[in-house]
């Protein structure tokens, strides 16, 4: 058995889960998420717990067992607490500004970058150099933060660019010059 897959998922109060024809829908105070569950995995629900088991010991069933449990747990956590990822912008003249549902980034290029936010994602900009990406879907929050970071990733010499708040950049020494 998968160590992660055999752990039960606790359903908090205020969360409703419905499972029909391999479609799982989780409704909570922060929103609604739905996902198609892979074949080879069975979901059993009680009043306040969900358990995931696999149908057989095939390679696909074994690999889907722990993954399915983790995805369902992330859905439950997302609709109750939500997820957030913090980004920092470093560099002279680098800044971010939020206009409606468009994030306007000035990252040292000859043109500003206008990034349209996907549905279900909220962004907060603090002091024009800190970006907080929030949402209920963990995958979408992470993907949106990665797209914003990819516009100008941190460079190793001066550390300029967009980086995750908890990311450390390994700095390189510059040219030493002739002596």
Swiss-Prot record:
PROSITE patterns: RIBOSOMAL_L6_1. The keyword Cytoplasm does not apply. GO terms for biological process: cytoplasmic translation. One of its GO terms (cellular component) is cytosolic large ribosomal subunit. Transmembrane segments: none annotated. SUPFAM superfamilies: Ribosomal protein L6. GO terms for molecular function: rRNA binding; structural constituent of ribosome. Keywords: Ribonucleoprotein, Ribosomal protein, RNA-binding, rRNA-binding. Pfam families: Ribosomal_L6. It comes from the Bacteria. Part of the 50S ribosomal subunit. This protein binds to the 23S rRNA, and is important in its secondary structure. It is located near the subunit interface in the base of the L7/L12 stalk, and near the tRNA binding site of the peptidyltransferase center. HAMAP family: Ribosomal_uL6_B. Belongs to the universal ribosomal protein uL6 family. NCBIfam families: L6_bact. This is Large ribosomal subunit protein uL6. It comes from Geotalea daltonii (strain DSM 22248 / JCM 15807 / FRC-32).
